[in-house]
Amino acid sequence: MEASAQALNAGFVMRMTRGLPLLRSKIAMSLDGRTALHNGASQWITGGAARRDGHHWRARSCAVLTGIGTVLADDAQLSVREVATTRQPLRVVLDSTLKLPLDARILQGGNLLIYTASRDVQKIAAVENAGAQVAVFAAANGKVDLRACVQDLAARGCNEILVEAGQRLNGALLQQGLVDELLLYLAPQLLGDMARGMAQLGELTSLEQRIELAWQDVRQFGGDLRIHASVKRR
């Protein structure tokens, strides 16, 4: 009973004990692990049933997080649309230099938080006037401080975060040990070695550097498979 309760409230337990929310990365990809063509085209790799399941995970999450690259490429909204919901999750964009266009669809409807490393007062004011909240967390490399952002989301009361991002942000979050679970939607297709991968992890020189996973669940949605896995902690 206790284990079942902890599983149902894993995000809350993690936030109370670690000061971090449960971070779950959702990635749609081909069977050879590719998430988009070399030119960025990715709509749609998976079918409608898999996408609807993805909206269920959006609906249960406190926040949906992405990078500015995904917003610029797809004009992403990050809202729950394909399933019934009583609330919309907080939408979070990591945008180190505040490149967000002021006519981006994600600015519609409010409930949007932008994390940036920029201290440009005019840019911040413009984004805030367009309806978003802006928080500055800069790392030493001039990019957004990922751990500080995730800790801030925990401080805002977020228990579960769904990440829907590209290979660079997916890789950075994994490398910093911030990802707890993966939702991998596999489509029965091959996109080739020039297509973009699921996570940019750089070169590993030893198997000791690998990120190990534990299987949680495998299900089929239409013609696609969903693999639910957790990241093993060393």
Each PLM stretch: what is its role?
Residues A3, A7-R15, P21-R234:
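Enzymes that bind and transform nitrogen-containing heteroaromatic metabolites
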